[in-house]
């Protein structure tokens, strides 16, 4: 197999959707046994206290959320537009995602970003949950 330059790889990534990139990262992590998590986040995790380290993290505040589209409601076109704005998906991909609800729109995002996305989607007429 020919060796690809960094620029060629970046050009290939630019052509991919966010969902495709997310799947690529998961596959990369599994193949090489690594994680794409920032080292700062890993170092900050023990500071949460002994409860989280012992597996009892029910009381600990969650710092990463998944934005789940439960249903598009009556205003599906508005929801598709909002999904496109949040994810940079194409029209076809966003429409398929909305029609396949319940589906995650954003995964492992910060609390404030998840809440903003939820508000935007609900404003467009969708039913959304954060997990």
Swiss-Prot record:
This is Large ribosomal subunit protein bL12. Keywords: Ribonucleoprotein, Ribosomal protein. Forms part of the ribosomal stalk which helps the ribosome interact with GTP-bound translation factors. Is thus essential for accurate translation. One of its GO terms (biological process) is translation. The keyword Ribosomal protein applies. PANTHER family: 39S RIBOSOMAL PROTEIN L12 (PTHR45987), LARGE RIBOSOMAL SUBUNIT PROTEIN BL12M (PTHR45987:SF4). The keyword Ribosomal protein applies. One of its GO terms (cellular component) is cytosolic large ribosomal subunit. It holds the Pfam family Ribosomal_L12. It comes from Nocardioides sp. (strain ATCC BAA-499 / JS614). Homodimer. Part of the ribosomal stalk of the 50S ribosomal subunit. Forms a multimeric L10(L12)X complex, where L10 forms an elongated spine to which 2 to 4 L12 dimers bind in a sequential fashion. Binds GTP-bound translation factors. The gene is rplL. GO terms for molecular function: mRNA binding; structural constituent of ribosome. Belongs to the bacterial ribosomal protein bL12 family.
